[in-house]
Amino acid sequence: MLSRAFMDAVEPLYNPGLGTEHVAGLLYSIVRMTRPRSLLEIGLGYTTPFLLQAMRDNIEEHAEDLRRLQRGEPDDPRLEVLRVEAYKRDYAPTVLAVDDLSDSDTTATEVPRVIAALGLDHLYTLHQGSFRRLTPTLVPPVVPFDFVWFDCGGPREYVDFLTEYWPHIQPHGGILLLHYTYWHMPTVRNRRAGSPLTPGPLEPSLMLREIKRQQGRLGLDARFEVASLVEPHKTRQGSVTLIRRLAETPPNGDCDMAAELEAGGFPGPYARFTL
């Protein structure tokens, strides 16, 4: 959990100009919820210890859940929500962090020291160098990645990253989060004031088209879900885009939600609703 001692320890890594004060906690929660077995972070900083703490908490929770399953106490409410199949494999997650530690405007060089002080250094491997052309050296269980957090550079880095790494993200629900995909600034279009919400370093729609182009070149389908979270009170460094890979896309039905549920064997009746 994110204790007061943890927050005090990571405080020196916080840079107000990099906009990750809310992102760090968001990453912690998503990793706790999805319990990835392979995690990649490109771009060290304030978020790194949050990711590692989430993984440590996942390991402890998995072990406790397994003990509960083995005891099998009939009045244990936790057992009502656990999927037994998820506990047939050991949970020994891998975390790979990549940074060349060359950006003096970040706190990346301080991250290893803080992580060691928190006792989290055994949970990750640090590759000090470029993320480019790294994937040929990666083998299971490091790949495919269940969870990727990319916060590094500008448009060129985003394109290079997607080109190399998209095929190595788990196709069955692998999650990719990218930082700073929008900004809020005045714009001028055809000499008239434009929308205050404008694309950031790489607009999400451009990223998605790039993914589809890459998959098309390989003869593969690119299926995914997308959500972007924008902080309306910031001019920059205030957005995150989440892309979740899908192995298959469910077909769109011609009936309403209630009918689909009933057709799928879920008992009705269901309340009807309209938009």
Language-model regions: role of each:
Residues 2-35, 49-53:
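Class I SAM-dependent methyltransferase Rossmann-like catalytic core
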Residues 33, 37-275:
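S-adenosylmethionine/decaboxylated-SAM
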